[in-house]
Structure formats: C-alpha cells, structure tokens
Amino acid sequence: MKRGRHIMKDLFEKAVAESKELTQRPSNETLLVMYGLYKQATEGDNENDPPSNPFDFVSKAKYEAWLGQKGKTREEAMAEYVELVNKLKG
C-alpha cells in the first residue's frame, strides 16, 4: 500500500508542476476545483474558520472550494487532481 501512495504522490507532484504550464488558463470555476483538491490532498479536511471579512470574496471562494472536498482522503484528492490536470492538458 505504501508503494501505491508513493506512486500517487509522484503523479500528483508532476500534475502540480504541469498545471503551471498549461497553454490555456482554466476557468475560475476549474481553478477553484483545483485549489480545493490541492488543499485536500496536501492538508486534509478544512477545519479552519471561514474568512472573517465578508467582502473578501476570493478567500471565501477558496475556503468553500476546499470545504467542498471534505471527507475525501488525501489519495482520492490527489487522484482527482491528476485526472483533472490530464484532462486540461488535452
């Protein structure tokens, strides 16, 4: 099982690097999904308090994107992130 996790982590790290080299910028909605999956994969469930500034829409959107991934294992989030980046690469 450890080997599978190590392989997934390598694939995830490769996908993170590739996401920075996409030829077309993904939509804001897709970027938020990527952000949520990345945070879930690297930190696990979002246990933070929501942003306190009601006018900080970017932080609120990021918070909610991560919160939307709650319950997924880190490996599941990594796999979904890899799949999404591969799809975006075409």
How does the language model describe each region?
Residues 3, 7-90:
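A charge-rich, low-complexity, intrinsically flexible signal that marks solvent-exposed coils, linkers
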